[in-house]
Structures are given as C-alpha cells and as structure tokens.
C-alpha cells in the first residue's frame, strides 16, 4: 500500500508581519489530496490578501470535483476580473489523485519544480504566464504515475532566489543534490531547505519564502491512519 506524505514550511520577508505566499492542502472528493501554492505580486498585507484569495478559491473548486487545469483557469478568471488585470500571482497545484493513481501538476509561472523519480532529480519548468494579468491563460500540466520513491518539491522565488543579493545564490544542481541528500523524511527536507535559504540571506529573508514536499512512500500499518501536524508561531 502506498502512502502520500506532504510537508510544508514558510516564513515572511524580513521586517514584514504577513507573507504574500499562501499554501493550502485539501482533500479530493474522489480520493487523494492536493497542495496549492500561490505567490501574489508584492509583499505584505495586500499580497497576503490576494494569495489567500487564490488558494482559497482553488481549494473550493477542487473540493467540488473540478480538474486541476480547469481550477487554474477559473481562479485566473476570478483574479483578472476582481483586480482588473493589475495583480499577478503564481499558482502551483500538485495533486495525488487516488482515482487515477497519479500525481498531477499544474503550474503557472514561478520557479521550476524539482521531481525525484527512480533516484534521479530533474527540473520541471513552468509556463511563464502568471494568473490574473493576461486575458487568456494556459497552465502547464504534467502527470506522473504514483509510485514509491516519487517526490515533488515546489517553492516560491524567495527560496529559489535566496542568496542572490548576497552573492550566494542557489544553483539547480545544488537544489538537486540537496534534495537527494535530505528527502527522507519530507518534513526534514522542507525545514532544512528553508533554513539554508534563510542562511543564504543572512537570516534576513529578501522575500517571502514557502516550500512544499510531496513524497510517495510505502505504508506498512494494518489500519489506515491519516495524520497531520501544524506548527504556527504566534
């Protein structure tokens, strides 16, 4: 029996009390779970409002049974109409679909995803079109069979570009090596990658940072038990 494990970690831009990056995890009506990540234009309260709007709408549509590509298009139309095409946002949806036994990924702008399959890590480039700005929009869709060892790592540009202003930027090769070395468990990878990105910004993040890790593993329990752990500093 396979098991889907998901971990997320995020922090705010230095000296900002609210993050413009939003993450949501929601169940799929036909079985499975989706991770939704949005990075809205700007930072602070206004960006937070817009990114929350995006992920909340996406989660609601997924719960109603909409397919991920249709979800991305509908959320785009909503943001475009509400903000008159003046506010952009990235949108990444990574879904473990138990009905099709596959991992489906929908991307609009933002950094590439990193996919670990068969012990090899590769990049999955996104479309360069964010949601909310252009009248028409098409997400990049990719699908992988659900198999043991498959892992998806998604992040916002606060992590992807960490260290750039200090002359210590990440390279894709460094990301790949880091993922291979720290993939188990997913919580550890999410936390250490966030910590390393913060360190590269000298403990003063230059942008909001968010990361998720979705991993397919083996479940060996007799009773299927779902668990969740959340830590939120007050």
Language-model features: locations:
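Beta-strand scaffold of nucleotide-dependent catalytic cores
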Residues: 35-38, 104-108, 224-226
């Amino acid at each position: 029996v396979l098991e889907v494990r998901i971990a997320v970690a995020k922090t705010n831009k230095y000296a900002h009390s609210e993050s413009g990056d939003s993450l949501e995890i929601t169940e799929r009506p036909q079985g499975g779970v989706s991770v939704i990540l949005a990075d809205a234009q700007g930072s602070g309260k206004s960006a937070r409002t817009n990114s929350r709007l995006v992920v909340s709408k996406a989660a609601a549509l997924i719960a109603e049974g909409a397919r991920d590509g249709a979800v991305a298009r509908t959320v785009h139309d909503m943001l475009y109409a509400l903000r008159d095409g003046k506010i952009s946002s990235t949108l990444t949806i990574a879904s473990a679909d138990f009905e099709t036994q596959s991992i489906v990924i929908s991307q609009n702008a933002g950094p590439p995803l990193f996919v670990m399959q068969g012990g090899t890590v590769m990049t999955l480039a996104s479309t360069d079109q964010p949601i909310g700005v252009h009248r028409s929009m098409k997400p990049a869709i990719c699908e992988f069979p659900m198999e043991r060892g498959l892992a998806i790592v998604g992040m916002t540009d606060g992590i992807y570009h960490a260290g750039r202003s200090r002359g210590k930027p990440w390279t894709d090769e460094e990301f790949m090596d880091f993922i291979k070395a720290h993939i188990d468990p997913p919580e550890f990878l999410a936390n250490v990658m966030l910590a390393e990105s913060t360190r590269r910004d000298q403990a003063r993040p230059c942008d909001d940072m968010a990361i998720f890790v979705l991993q397919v593993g083996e479940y060996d329990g007799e009773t299927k038990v779902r668990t969740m752990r959340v830590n939120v500093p007050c």
